[in-house]
From Swiss-Prot:
This is Argininosuccinate lyase 2. PANTHER family: ARGININOSUCCINATE LYASE. The keyword Lyase applies. InterPro entries: Arg_succ_lyase_C, Argininosuccinate_lyase, Fumarase/histidase_N, Fumarate_lyase_CS, Fumarate_lyase_fam, Fumarate_lyase_N, L-Aspartase-like. Its EC number is 4.3.2.1. It catalyses: 2-(N(omega)-L-arginino)succinate = fumarate + L-arginine. Keywords: Amino-acid biosynthesis, Arginine biosynthesis, Cytoplasm, Lyase. Pathway: Amino-acid biosynthesis; L-arginine biosynthesis; L-arginine from L-ornithine and carbamoyl phosphate: step 3/3. The lineage of its organism: Bacteria, Pseudomonadati, Pseudomonadota, Gammaproteobacteria, Pseudomonadales. It is an enzyme of class 4 (lyase). It comes from the Bacteria. GO terms for biological process: arginine biosynthetic process via ornithine; L-arginine biosynthetic process. One of its GO terms (cellular component) is cytosol. It comes from Pseudomonas fluorescens (strain Pf0-1). Its main location: cytoplasm.
């Protein structure tokens, strides 16, 4: 006869129930219930394996699997009663299974611990989340390629130090973000490889005495391999940290992009127009059209950075193997994945709808002596050392500042006062078109190179 006074699956060793506040404090079911689908997936594979090796009968396996599928239906229909006193998603599902099918439900946990169970659940969940995020990155990149192809020759100022530097094209600028997102994609693909290793079968920390077949279970669950050390398998959260690191870099890219969009929509720049559906107004100022989507993405970046630091701090002092600290791994991981996925979705919807204001961008590119480097390069081709050319053009720019003239607005006589090597053909390189067309190499801003880069980008996406 049971003498359990705790009403818990582990209560045999205890003589009094857990304090009510402690039960609530230590429970995780309020947030880990989102793992239910992956918990059930892992349990079905585990039961299938146990029957294969003879620990369960085929009838017991079938009863367990049918019960788990019914429970999944209850959860998805909103008919499942999540109980805090049962601590977590695992025990809630197991208790409901036992209620439905009787003592056979208690056999499911044979050869398994919640330590390897939760580690498996998180990896299964994160694997799916990475796939969703990769899909959103691809969708955003397609939008960037659309803009780059459409605006391959649309001239705008390029900046360093937020000062006018050299003319570029809007399409070239869009491709810069495409490149960053390609690296984000690669990082997440690499992260998925290390995530897709199965800890199940490690039990609490040392393995199990049952004749389990871990490779078979891994095959059922779509894992690439099984984890090689039971101690490491149950305590490893590197994959979650690595994901949050990759997510942080991706959010940093989106935050930088957001900053540019906020600047470009301002009255001081007016480079682009965002459709109304991506903006909001002011409760007091009737004229306002605020770029809330990029502003909010910029703000949400801090949440993902915080998740990374939270997980690093969580793990830094833990001895092997599993510790209750690891219950705190889920909320930051969940939040980082949700935030990145939603931010990418917002950008993927918004970017194709951006409308550049060509005349304003072109006018801005004409200000700030953006073709000064082209004049220096022109003189280099005339045989002068670059440093001498740099100084000559610096004097010409100073003259332009004093007289209010851009280099292209000066007469040949005015330009020749700085170097007698300057001839009439200089004006071909001082135009905006001449400047961008001259940068005709892989990675350059020439419209022909932008179009070629779009083709390469399309091929990259098609290869995924």
């Amino acid at each position: 006869m049971s003498t359990d006074k705790t009403n818990q699956s582990w209560g045999g060793r205890f003589s009094e129930p857990v304090d009510a506040f402690v039960a609530r404090f230590t429970a995780s079911v309020t947030f880990d219930q989102r793992l239910y689908r992956h918990d059930i997936m892992g349990s079905i594979a585990h039961a299938t394996m146990l029957a294969k090796v003879g620990v369960l009968t085929d009838a017991e396996r079938d009863s367990i699997i049918d019960g788990l599928k019914t429970i999944q239906g209850e959860i998805e229909a909103g008919q499942f009663d999540w109980r805090v006193d049962l601590e977590d998603v695992h025990m809630n599902i197991e208790a409901r299974l036992t209620d439905r099918i009787g003592v056979t439900g208690k056999k499911l946990h044979t050869g398994r611990s919640r330590n390897d169970q939760v580690a498996t659940d998180i990896r299964l969940w994160l694997r799916d989340e990475i796939d969703l995020i990769l899909s959103e990155i691809t969708r955003l990149q397609k939008g960037l390629l659309e803009q780059a192809e459409r605006e391959a020759a649309s001239i705008m100022p390029g900046f360093t130090h937020l000062q006018t530097a050299q003319p570029v094209t809007f399409g070239h600028h869009m491709l810069a973000w495409f490149e960053m997102l390609s690296r984000d994609y690669e990082r997440l693909v690499d992260c998925r490889k290390r995530t897709n290793r199965m800890p199940l079968g490690s039990a609490a920390l040392a393995g199990t005495t049952y004749p389990i077949d871990r490779e078979y279970t891994a095959q059922l669950l779509g894992f690439d391999a099984v984890g090689g050390n039971s101690l490491d398998n149950v305590s490893d959260r590197d994959f979650a940290i690595e994901f949050c690191s990759a997510a942080s870099i991706a959010m940093m890219h989106l935050s930088r992009f957001s900053e540019e969009l906020v600047l470009w929509t301002s009255a001081q720049f007016q480079f682009i127009d965002l459709p109304d559906r991506f903006c909001t107004g002011s409760s007091i100022m009737p004229q306002k059209k605020n770029p809330d989507v990029p502003e909010l993405v910029r703000g949400k970046t801090g949440r993902v950075f915080g998740a990374l630091m939270g997980l690093l701090t969580l793990m830094k002092g833990q001895p092997l193997a599993y510790n209750k600290d690891n219950q705190e791994d889920k909320e930051p991981l969940f939040d980082a994945a949700d935030t990145l996925r939603d931010s990418l979705r917002a950008f993927a919807d918004m970017i194709p709808a951006i409308k550049p204001k060509h005349a304003i961008m072109r006018e801005a590119a004409l200000r700030g002596f953006s073709t000064a480097t082209d004049l220096a390069d022109y003189l280099v081709r005339r045989g002068l050392p670059f440093r001498d050319c740099h100084e000559i053009v610096g004097h010409a720019v100073k003259y332009g500042v004093d007289t209010g003239k851009d280099l292209a607005e000066m007469s040949l006589e005015e330009l020749r006062q700085f170097s007698d090597q300057i001839e009439q053909d200089v004006f071909a390189v001082l135009t905006l078109e001449g400047s961008v067309n001259a940068r005709d190499h892989i990675g350059g801003t020439a419209p022909a190179q932008v179009k070629a880069a779009v083709v390469r980008g399309q091929a990259l996406i098609a290869s995924r």
